[in-house]
């Protein structure tokens, strides 16, 4: 192992360089300490260095911020594999493997598994939402949500209307990346009625595809943080719903 004290730009100007893989983890902080997301703003500028990196190696791996957009990754590296990595349902990084084996998008939940699909692959839309049908709610792992793979992953296992929403299943699905809860009831979101019924109670509030933050929902409904109830809020089409979980 050779340790080189030089900037990437300076080092890549050297002659005779050739590597099997290049791994880049650009500095994502500005001179003033501000967090950076755009790859072109990071140091070194991997986008500007791409032509030289291609000469030095046919394989490039770039570690990006968890906020980095998958679509932007594929725009910058069209033939790459893009992997969204999560741990404990928290997105940790977006990794680009620019080695000509793509395009492919992968969601990896560490300790749970992975799921891959080609960009643009779609799942058939589910039918009309019928709250009486469903016995289980699926919360797709955040890696699926970030990679926009939730609908494809749950196809045939649960009905889901958006990559940012919940899945609804008649029977408990197996082999899904995410958490599954038995449903007690699904009902229209009626804040006045809910507040009359639930004010002062402890609850865990979950939400996806819903315009209010969990904290704001708790405030409006008079709830306190706790394990007494588990409520999930979502929007499907033009309608808002609350799901009581067992």
Whereabouts are the PLM-identified features?
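SAM-dependent transferase fold signal centered on methyltransferase-like domains
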Residues: 1-246
